[in-house]
From Swiss-Prot:
Subunit: Interacts with TERF2; the interaction is direct.
Protein name per the record: 5' exonuclease Apollo
UniProt domain comment: The TBM domain mediates interaction with TERF2.
Keywords: Chromosome, DNA damage, DNA repair, Exonuclease, Hydrolase, Nuclease, Nucleus, Telomere
Subcellular location field: Chromosome, Telomere; Nucleus
Organism the protein comes from: Gallus gallus (Chicken)
Length: 457
């Protein structure tokens, strides 16, 4: 999953595991590629910020309820909560894709998501002359020896390939989102329809693309199919019916399994030289890779701002501080003795034992049996030998006498068992104890002695 929880902020980008998101409470979606939506589904129930086009795709494809989707206009600054301002910038990657420029007490952070650098980005007012404290960079093509042409040059290569095969049907392998611009360019260049599946046609209309797509077989020379369909066996079967060439527009290394499969270096990610140009122009204080792994940091270090040693304090917002302090406090608390002992004995089924107070004191009436400090709600008798405690829960107004005496009922509440049911003066807290718990040997011995004490003389 290509997502990030940004440290020192309440921000998570393309990260949809709430359980692992820590204190993040502001969730952003950069674009709708599947590797950036892992964990995002129709059950999502928190505000989610994205571009308007991504918002439409999100509801259409993943059925995320619209009440949780917060579309933000691209090119404008938006106050999100009380601590963060965000500006969405075109990422030049796929329809609806954006970069996020975050500003707050944590400094200024640019999160590129997946992006293809263009010199036009240097004319973006939100970035021009801006100090960037942290740059989260798409390092997909961070390979010094991996040169890539611009997308316009790659599209020209595809057109030249098609011209060399005038009698062939052309099948182009694409993912569920992306390469739409290439398909439109080729359709207009050759004056033909692009045949697609019904679901893809529905998405093309949602994206409001030019009307060059159809589902009618045989209506056009160019077909757009899922990239997984471009393989040896399908090429064999297609060429039996009609001469066919396949095009894979990708900047990634791919193993070609058929002589009629052609790779065109059309990439929606920045090349290594473009990344260097972008970082050199931006001069961030630090660079952090979005795609985990080797990101050739040394290649960018020389372009960092000379102020990179003077980063602003990455203060944790108050809601995060409270959460961290509470977690720290709970971790430092010592477990009471009975919790430790409970692991050594099976707890009687159907009985719930409340946690004891940390301090216990010796009871005068029972040898070897201790009682914890009592509060106004409950009394308890514990055997330290067996690690078992028994409780007598009462209304707040009930109070206990000295050990060995009977419990007196308060004026505002009554015990569930009256004195008339038990002619002896045996304390009720023992009579209400579960019988299977009373089988503990040391406690039974103490009870036996207690019964002997109260036998009529």
């Amino acid at each position: 999953m290509n997502g990030t929880v940004i440290p020192g902020t309440p921000i998570a980008v393309d990260f949809w595991s709430v359980r692992r998101a820590g204190g993040a409470r502001l969730f952003f979606l950069s674009h709708m590629h599947s590797d950036h939506t892992v964990g995002l589904s129709s059950t999502w129930s928190r505000p989610l910020y994205c571009s308007p086009l991504t918002a439409r795709l999100l509801h259409h494809r993943l059925k995320v309820p619209t009440r949780w989707i917060r579309p933000l206009e691209v090119g404008q600054s938006h106050a999100v909560g009380e601590e963060v301002t965000v500006t969405l910038l075109d990422a030049n990657h796929c329809p609806g894709s954006v970069m996020f420029l975050f500003e707050g007490a944590f400094g200024t952070i640019l999160y590129t998501g997946d992006f293809r650098y263009s010199p036009a980005m240097q004319r973006e007012p939100a970035l021009s002359g801006r100090r960037i404290d942290r740059l989260y960079l798409d390092n997909t093509n961070c390979r010094p020896h991996g040169a890539l042409p611009s997308r316009s040059r790659a599209a020209l290569q595809a057109a030249q390939l098609i011209r060399r095969h005038p009698q062939h049907r052309v099948v182009i392998g694409v993912y569920s989102l992306g390469k739409e611009e290439l398909l439109v360019d080729l359709a207009l260049e050759f004056g033909t329809w692009v045949v697609v599946s019904p679901s893809r046609l529905e998405q093309m209309r949602l994206l409001e693309l030019p009307e060059v797509f159809t589902t009618e077989e045989g209506a056009g020379r160019i077909h757009a199919v899922d990239v997984a369909e471009i393989r040896w066996d399908t090429l064999v079967s297609w060429n039996v019916l009609h001469p066919t060439i396949a095009i894979l527009p990708t900047g990634r290394p791919v193993k070609v399994t058929h002589p009629q499969i052609h790779l065109i270096p059309y990439s929606d990610h920045s090349s290594f030289s473009e990344l260097c140009e972008f970082v050199k122009w931006l001069k961030p204080c630090s660079v952090i890779p979005i795609v985990k792994g080797d990101m050739c940091y040394a290649s960018f270090q020389k372009y960092l701002s000379p102020d990179h040693q003077a980063l602003p304090g990455l203060g944790i917002p108050k809601p995060l501080q409270v959460s961290v302090q509470w977690q720290s406090k709970t971790k430092k608390q010592k477990p009471v003795c009975l919790v430790k002992r409970a692991a050594q004995h099976s707890v009687p089924k159907g009985v719930v034992y409340e946690p004891l107070e940390e301090y216990i004191e010796q009871s005068d009436g029972l040898g070897g049996v201790t009682a914890p400090q009592q509060n106004s709600h409950e009394s308890a008798f514990c055997s330290l030998e067996d690690g078992i405690c028994f409780y007598d829960c009462k209304e707040e107004e009930l109070s206990g006498e000295q050990p060995g005496g009977a419990m007196a009922a308060g004026t505002a509440g009554q015990s569930l068992v009256s004195d008339e049911d038990f002619p002896s003066e045996l304390p009720k807290q023992y009579l209400l104890t579960p019988l299977n718990a009373l089988k503990q040997s040391s406690f039974c011995k103490a009870l036996k002695n207690l019964f002997i004490r109260w036998e009529p003389s």
